[in-house]
């Protein structure tokens, strides 16, 4: 396919037009008085959101050169979202400011490579200063403040703070859509996995259709159990002790299943069988987790163990097990705390090594089941459109809170970026490097300027006053007052602010050093029709 090539000023200007179109659509959402953006969906109702990265991902421009500029800024938002989970609008605003200022200077004759060095030098200093003024997050109230600022809703803040208090920093908090109007929190304590009983005849409570086992023995194996003879020996030992039993196996079927159900109905013993969770290697790892949590062993040929020779000593135990049609929950497993800690550290090490987002998520779930618990925030709303918008805001709030726990908090509302202005301005440089530093200085003011603008105020006036205020004092755009931002609970996670600045400067510096842009020429004849495929002239239909 033929290509279009643009050089130097033409190339950069075309990309800037794309940057501006995307950034202008995103930045109207910034701050407490930011507006929403409506996104068309080909199927279903439109999506109304103020989430920067969601908006950025939806934007495709017709002009290929402009589209490349838009995609670069979309990358800033996506990368910030991947690292910190929030701050995507701030990152977009910073990137636009740096690119606009940078292109002015490059057009005026500045050397882009020198400008880039200046940007990198200024951002490195800015990040050091952000870390220096960062405060650790210690109380439930602080967590609630971070979540409330991100979601724009105090109730959501309290809900997320309670969830984190209940499941700990290692716990998993998931967000689901509720069928009702209210948003509520559901916490599962203990280890839960998504496998239920293999037969409904195993229930102990026919009203709730669940099996509750008090102080059961737990047999854990990766084998299929077809014949009752395979587990007869260990079953007899458990019956002698007069305690119930949970069997976790690849499957329990045929004669083994029938015998277990028959004896359960006769009242000979209380036993429940469930399938092992997960698949393949992940299944083995999860069975090992259950074994560590309950103080048992996985009966597997990999370790040279057989079901026929299994003893009570190899079984795990727990205070209580609840099994429903869909889930099994093990409460207060009797495993050794030292072994559980070692297993937790092993999973943490695997999380640091993996490059797959999916694997990391699954490892995080396993970690939560061992170390904390699982909390589910069920999001309710009157309409589907409101539900989607609310769910996105709560996801942002949760990510913000996690980032705050990790690296601490700084004054919110863009105040922290202006408060480090003087430290960055004190950097000594000359020529184009100094120009690069000045570009970053101008961009540090931009989030405050945009928040004020979205609140219907003159941003430059607010910025000038902010530079002369005491450290930590900022402008609360929600009510127009000047307050101590941290005392007022207007805070941003340090990680979010840092990531936004780093990613914005990275893309801005690359765009400024661009000298040629290559794009596909549009096909004037439109897309070619597909082959006929013997369908009588319907080849072009898709």
From Swiss-Prot:
Gene3D superfamilies reported in the protein's UniProt record: GroEL, GroEL-like equatorial domain, TCP-1-like chaperonin intermediate domain
S-S pairs: none
PROSITE patterns associated with the record: CHAPERONINS_CPN60
Keyword terms of this UniProt record: ATP-binding, Chaperone, Cytoplasm, Isomerase, Nucleotide-binding
Xref: SUPFAM superfamilies: GroEL apical domain-like, GroEL equatorial domain-like, GroEL-intermediate domain like
Role of this protein: Together with its co-chaperonin GroES, plays an essential role in assisting protein folding. The GroEL-GroES system forms a nano-cage that allows encapsulation of the non-native substrate proteins and provides a physical environment optimized to promote and accelerate protein folding.
Family to which this protein belongs: Belongs to the chaperonin (HSP60) family.
Listed name of the protein: Chaperonin GroEL
Organism: Listeria innocua serovar 6a (strain ATCC BAA-680 / CLIP 11262)
Lineage start: Bacteria, Bacillati, Bacillota, Bacilli, Bacillales
